[in-house]
């Protein structure tokens, strides 16, 4: 997908990571939506991940709503990670605890 305002070069599109965690916040904002996810590590510590989505307009056309995920929801997120190794990425897909999948990139 071409983007008029910036590239997605910050993300490693050759990798897809899977993160299971609890939604801390979902920001339904322009120019991009953001999902803040708290992930539990095997040692019991937590990491907060910032996952960038497309615009509300694009996500809305894909079935998203501002309350598609809410704080406290347990979700699995598939993401292209940041190339820097920081805890962030580009959302590809979100799977709710009930197994419902919500795509985050147009097909």
Q: Positions of the model-derived regions?
A:
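Short boundary/loop segments of OB/S1/cold-shock single-stranded nucleic-acid-binding domains
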Residues: 3-17
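Conserved hydrophobic positions within beta-strands
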Residues: 21-23
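Short aromatic-glycine-enriched beta-strand elements
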Residues: 29-40
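A short macromolecule-binding patch
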Residues: 42-54
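Short, structured beta-strand/loop micro-motifs enriched in basic residues and often containing a Trp
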Residues: 53-61
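Short nucleic-acid-contacting surface segments enriched for D/E, G, S/T with interspersed K/R
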Residues: 61-76
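OB-fold/S1-family single-stranded nucleic acid-binding modules
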Residues: 82-105
